[in-house]
Design a protein with these regions (language model features):
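Acyltransferase donor/substrate-recognition loop-hinge adjacent to the catalytic core
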Residues: 2-4, 150-230
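Catalytic cores of nucleotide-enabled group-transfer and carboxylate-activating enzymes in metabolic
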Residues: 12-15, 34-46, 53-62, 67-74, ...
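Generic, well-ordered alpha-helical scaffold segments in large soluble proteins
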Residues: 21, 109, 113, 220-224, ...
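A conserved beta-strand-loop-helix scaffold within acyl/acetyltransferase catalytic domains
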Residues: 22-64, 72-82, 203-204, 208-309
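Acyl-donor binding region in acyl/amide transferases
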Residues: 83-164, 282-358
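Short beta-strand segments
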Residues: 123, 175, 257, 270, ...
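A structural motif corresponding to the C-terminal lobe/cap of the Radical SAM core domain
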Residues: 358, 362-369, 373
Length: 376
């Protein structure tokens, strides 16, 4: 029987191997969506990822003979420990062939890392922060992945459960029908709610007009989710990074902002056209030709993804979503959108799930993080 050898990623050559491993593993899987290689590389650069300023991280590759058969990253988020009192090793970027010797060796590496730092718990898959991809797929293996969700084969959860890991957090995802005509009560309520609470939908003529609202959006995101047990506030440095990286290419028609009579933001939603098929065609590289597929996906698409939604706690359950959906419908009516897919939502987050009730929600994916208490 061949031994599994674990090696730490110590140079860029090995980092490229680390990034490309799942692309090879899932090369014949029509539902896997590869990331952009340069974006993945930037995750591990301090100048590109502000979370590295308060986190420790290592990456490892698993080998059998000279062949790569698995990978894992381990992370300690010191901000999480200091602000929430949560002391754990996060593990992520977990991929492996269907061989329990490989998955065992990878998890043992995470345990070893935790023990070296006197930490008694590991949890994953997850990234550095709440805005990173998290959760191992447990339902929906036959559904096309999104650019904001992890994908894995059905054997992954079985491997972790056989190793003694247990469910920590559960996420659900929904597919919503984007109606040709909004439900009558939504049309009616949107006007009534706007009038009652003196709310308005902000109109943007260009991307430049959106930028002053980016920071308020993230602050509102904190207000929306701060009651959740695992939520850590977004730092100003993270906001700056996300603003520079993403808001430059998001179509203004996919951003909806609702403000009160004092022009204070009370709700927002960011949707994006599905870039899954464009990413599959890109095969990890945007240039020289793949940018064209992204351009086309933005112009005409039958599917969009809810990327972020934030509603101030004072306005949750007050019908503000009717204003948001009416605005989204108006903005996207000529883009061919038929389905909206939500991002992963914690199962416990009923305040967000109730938002979809008027749009025939289908729970088509589930995912979870697994944890293990480490014995001394």
């Amino acid at each position: 029987m061949e031994n599994v050898i674990i090696k730490q990623v110590l140079n860029e050559k090995d980092l490229i191997k680390f990034i490309k491993f799942p692309m090879e593993l899932y090369r014949n899987n029509p539902n896997y969506v590869p990331p952009l290689i340069n974006e993945e590389k930037n995750i591990w650069k301090k100048e590109e990822n502000p979370a590295l300023s308060y986190s420790e991280a290592k990456q490892f590759l698993a080998y059998k003979n000279t062949k790569i058969v698995g990978r894992i990253a381990v992370i300690i988020n010191h901000k999480e420990e200091n602000e929430l009192g949560i002391k754990k090793v996060r593990f992520g970027w977990l991929d492996f062939i269907d061989d329990e010797a490989v998955s065992k060796a990878l998890i043992e590496e995470a345990i070893k890392f935790a023990r070296a730092h006197h930490i008694e718990k590991i949890e994953g898959p997850m990234g550095f922060t709440n805005l990173d991809k998290a959760g191992m797929l447990t339902m929906g293996f036959d559904k096309l992945a999104t650019m904001i969700g992890l994908y894995n084969d059905a054997y992954y959860p079985k491997h972790l459960e056989n190793l003694g890991l247990v469910k920590e957090k559960e996420w659900v995802e929904f597919e919503l029908q984007f109606p040709d005509k909004l439900p009558e009560k939504v049309e009616k309520f949107s006007s009534l709610i706007a009038q009652k609470y003196k709310l308005k939908t902000l109109k943007f003529n260009n991307k430049k007009e959106i930028l002053p609202y980016v920071e308020p959006m993230f602050k509102l995101l904190d207000e929306t989710y701060k009651h959740l047990s695992t939520y850590t506030p977004i730092s100003d440095e993270q906001i700056k990074t996300y603003k520079e990286k993403y808001f430059g290419f998001i179509d203004k028609d996919y951003i909806t902002c609702v403000a009160d009579e004092n022009n204070q933001l009370v709700a927002f939603a960011i949707t994006m056209p599905s870039y899954s098929k464009a990413l599959q065609k890109a095969k990890g590289k945007l240039f020289p030709f793949a940018w064209w597929h992204f351009l086309q996906a933005g112009k005409k698409n039958d599917r969009a993804n809810f990327y972020l939604i934030g509603i101030h706690p004072e306005y949750q359950r007050r019908g503000v979503t009717s204003i948001i959906f009416k605005a989204i419908k108006m903005n996207l009516k000529d883009k061919g959108i038929k389905f909206l897919e939500t991002n992963p939502e914690l199962e416990e987050n009923k305040n967000v799930q109730v938002l979809w009730q008027d749009y025939n929600p289908v729970n088509h994916k589930r995912r979870r993080t697994y944890s293990l208490e480490i014995k001394a």
